[in-house]
Amino acid sequence: MAKTLYEKLFDAHVVFEAPNETPLLYIDRHLVHEVTSPQAFDGLRAHHRPVRQPGKTFATMDHNVSTQTKDINASGEMARIQMQELIKNCNEFGVELYDLNHPYQGIVHVMGPEQGVTLPGMTIVCGDSHTATHGAFGALAFGIGTSEVEHVLATQTLKQGRAKTMKIEVTGSAAPGITAKDIVLAIIGKTGSAGGTGHVVEFCGDAIRALSMEGRMTLCNMAIEMGAKAGLVAPDETTFNYVKGRLHAPKGCDFDEAVEYWKTLKTDDGATFDTVVTLRAEEIAPQVTWGTNPGQVISVTDIIPDPASFSDPVERASAEKALAYMGLQPGVPLTDVAIDKVFIGSCTNSRIEDLRAAAEVAKGRKVAPGVQALVVPGSGPVKAQAEAEGLDKIFIEAGFEWRLPGCSMCLAMNNDRLNPGERCASTSNRNFEGRQGRGGRTHLVSPAMAAAAAVTGHFADIRSIK
């Protein structure tokens, strides 16, 4: 019987299945951070249980770390407690930890792939909704809650029901300046923020194959923003070349054997999907969100939509509420909207390719008066590589702030946040009310578009910036 990639990955990891019961899956990799793990470790301690597979468990600090200093006290008391608990728990249970002073420390979904912890064919979980990022490698990766974190720590397994399948095909070639971020925002604009609910999405088509691994990670990172359980891209030579030689990747003959298996990780001819969505890459322009969910998105050359133009009463009410929160008026060109802050970073867009794209725009220009612009590399290795390439100097000379690795302004859990009413061009993944700080207004864009907003002081079409 012909199977989709998702079905192959799921079936290969079923440990036990009985009639009328949720299947039990084996988990190959468990990624841990300071926010969703303390209670899970406390649960192990209370029941006198060890971590079953410490060698398959990797921890880092990211959500509430300061990006201005490596001082554990810098982000407040709660952050300090969570980070100290992670240090204590990893020491006690034998889990490898990339702490604030470790050269590999960084955002969990940046660290995993760059250290070769993430490999094709694996099941990967983390107490974080954007675990879908790792699906870029052809791995079944999804976020879990704290009680499930404890279950995986104790058993290396997890009960999971089968999801529906969705194929999103992006045909043709994207125009110059159009990035994976624009592609995925255009997809969510078409499906809506709940269009993938109950599904695992496989992204395919010529435009997807043309993406680098960084681009594919951006794509899968935001699968959750259309309501999907996970996102997938079938592995290919781009994947294998990225993985080869990384710290935890197979070496020598083991790598060659692994590649032979990884080549089988693709949807069979004749396999059927529950839902199919198609987009033409050449029709995708630079995208900017205008509302308070990622599905409320338009091209940078468009005008702010009028809620009256929505036929669906729920969408109309949502648009009215979003415009009121965002302080925007219908009919205004997006390029007339001024910004206060710019954030280039997050598990969506903080990799070396993202920083290069932003630096290309920043080079020889200056951040607009009154704008604060942050560049936050996703990990220690990304920061080191960017500095070796001189990107930090480009940003600093242009007036951007060059920070230490962390989740930063993606979410208001550290010192990097918006003040009420401030408007931000952000390369992160969520533009919900208050996501970047109480009363803050978030517009999601690509790294190049964020840099363009920083130097012009308003949203600008990257295609018109020479």
From Swiss-Prot:
Its recorded reaction(s) are: (2R,3S)-3-isopropylmalate = (2S)-2-isopropylmalate
Positions with a binding annotation for [4Fe-4S] cluster: C347, C407, C410
Q: What class of enzyme is it?
A: lyase
What InterPro entries does this protein's entry cite?
Answer: 3-IsopropMal_deHydase_lsu, Acnase/IPM_dHydase_lsu_aba_1/3, Acoase/IPM_deHydtase_lsu_aba, Aconitase_4Fe-4S_BS, Aconitase_4Fe-4S_dom, IPM_dehydratase_rel_enz, IPMI_cat
Q: What are the required cofactors?
A: [4Fe-4S] cluster
- Under Enzyme Commission nomenclature, its number is 4.2.1.33
Q: Name one GO biological process term.
A: L-leucine biosynthetic process
Say yes or no: keyword 4Fe-4S present: yes
Assembly: Heterodimer of LeuC and LeuD.
Role: Catalyzes the isomerization between 2-isopropylmalate and 3-isopropylmalate, via the formation of 2-isopropylmaleate.
Family recorded in the similarity comment: Belongs to the aconitase/IPM isomerase family. LeuC type 1 subfamily.
Q: What is the protein's given name?
A: 3-isopropylmalate dehydratase large subunit
